[in-house]
């Protein structure tokens, strides 16, 4: 359950900018993912980056119209959800997606989805991150 966005042809300036913002949001989510931090607070961390670039605010477009991520288990998409109002604290052993899709209405959307698991030392990446818009699969 990972997602990569790539461009057929060459990315224009707006596509490149939004891809880089998406990457910045992913890193902000990872950095906010500390033990005992609530899922709601992690979603808030993604929206702080959006607002820095005059996207959103909140769940408005252009921006991130849905949750930042979800728990991962036997059903792939499951509780808890990385969304405003989910007060579940992160605990050792939890695994969740980090997938803050940015939508630019009538133009395009960009989503990079990776996974984080929580250890006693804090968050660890479970998947290999996309390298760049030109090489999203790190080939």
Model region roles, listed by residue range:
Residues 1-139:
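Active-site neighborhoods and metal-handling regions in enzymes and metal-associated proteins
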């Amino acid at each position: 359950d990972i997602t990569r966005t790539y461009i057929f042809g060459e990315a224009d300036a707006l596509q490149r900018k939004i891809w880089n913002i998406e990457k910045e949001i992913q890193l902000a989510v990872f950095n906010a993912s500390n033990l005992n931090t609530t899922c709601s607070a992690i979603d808030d961390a993604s929206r702080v980056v959006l607002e820095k670039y005059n996207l959103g605010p909140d769940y408005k477009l252009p921006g991130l119209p849905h949750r930042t991520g979800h728990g991962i288990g036997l059903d792939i998409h499951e509780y808890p959800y990385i969304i405003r109002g989910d007060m579940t604290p992160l605990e050792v052993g939890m695994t969740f997606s980090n997938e803050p899709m940015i939508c630019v209405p009538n133009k395009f959307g960009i989503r990079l989805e990776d996974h984080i698991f929580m250890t006693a030392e804090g968050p660890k990446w479970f998947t290999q991150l996309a390298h760049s818009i030109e090489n999203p699969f790190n080939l």
